[in-house]
Each structure stands twice: as C-alpha cells, then as structure tokens.
C-alpha cells in the first residue's frame, strides 16, 4: 500500500476527522486528526491499515495560535511508510484520549509528553511524572512560555 492509498483510505473512512493530509516524501505522510477521533483513527490505522508500530508521541507548543499539538509518529512493518498524525489542542485545556489501549508503548511517551507540555491523556492507566521531580509538575518546561532558571522551581533544584 503506497502513501496515496493510505491517505485516501483515511480520508474516506474519516472525512470529518482527517484534514490537511499530504505526502511529505514517498515514505512519509502527514495528517491532522480531530482530537476527539484520534484514538478511533489509531485503532483503524492499526487494525485495518497495518500501522502496527507507534514510534513516538510528543508535543509542540504554538503560543501565537494559543494551542498545543499532540504528535504521533506511526509506522507499518508491511508498508514502507511513516505517518505523522497531529491533533490540535487548546492551550488552556489540552486533553486527548490516551492510545495506550491501542499501542501499549504509548504509556511512557504519553507520560513524558504530559509532564513536559501539560497535555492530559484521558484514561491513561498511570499518568504520573516520569522524569521530572514531583515539585515540577505543572511547570511544563517544554512550553515556550516556560521561564526556566531562575524561576521558583528551578531555583529550588540547584
């Protein structure tokens, strides 16, 4: 299955949920997904299109647009294609359904994204800090408005 066929399948199955789908290169495709359909789209990708490997989950902060993005890189062992699936989230309440039940390895990726960007993954089995100390929870150090040193928390760490 080539990139064009994958995009056609996604947009055909989820016409209201998939937008801005395109081919970056013969082996790289991208698409935006409605945040409320992201888990369902991931289930379809894995179950019907053989996108069986979640490579990463991360975040991107766009303060000028007042939003964050949850970014998923999903690959297929059957097709030489990697899909970058993005979901736009409001910056003041960035929530999206966890995909741990679809891709087990999303567990730590989502935890890291939560503690660094503040993206809340609903129904995550154990959404707690992964690498940062407990007193930094709520600081969201990878957001662009994070003040860094010498803010209150960073000063206490040194």
Swiss-Prot record:
Keywords: Cell membrane, Electron transport, Membrane, Methanogenesis, Methanol utilization, Oxidoreductase, Transport
Catalytic activity, EC: 1.5.98.3
GO cellular component: plasma membrane
Membrane topology: Peripheral membrane protein
pH-activity note: Optimum pH is 8.5.
GO terms for MF: Methanosarcina-phenazine hydrogenase activity; NADH dehydrogenase (ubiquinone) activity; reduced coenzyme F420 dehydrogenase activity
Predominant localisation class: membrane
Temperature and activity: Optimum temperature is 39 degrees Celsius.
GO biological process, one term: methanogenesis
Enzymatic reactions: methanophenazine + reduced coenzyme F420-(gamma-L-Glu)(n) = dihydromethanophenazine + oxidized coenzyme F420-(gamma-L-Glu)(n) + H(+)
Enzyme class: oxidoreductase
Subcellular location, record wording: Cell membrane
Family (UniProt): Belongs to the complex I 30 kDa subunit family.
Subunit structure comment from the entry: The FPO complex is composed of at least 13 different subunits.
Job description of the protein: Component of the F(420)H(2) dehydrogenase (FPO complex) which is part of the energy-conserving F(420)H(2):heterodisulfide oxidoreductase system. The membrane-bound electron transfer system of the complex plays an important role in the metabolism of methylotrophic methanogens when the organisms grow on methanol or methylamines. Catalyzes the oxidation of methanophenazine to dihydromethanophenazine. It shuttles electrons from F(420)H(2), via FAD and iron-sulfur (Fe-S) centers, to methanophenazine (an electron carrier in the membrane).
NCBIfam families recorded: F420_dehyd_FpoC (NF040611), NuoC_fam (TIGR01961), PRK06074.2-2 (NF004735)
Protein's name in the database: F(420)H(2) dehydrogenase subunit C
Species this protein is from: Methanosarcina mazei (strain ATCC BAA-159 / DSM 3647 / Goe1 / Go1 / JCM 11833 / OCM 88)
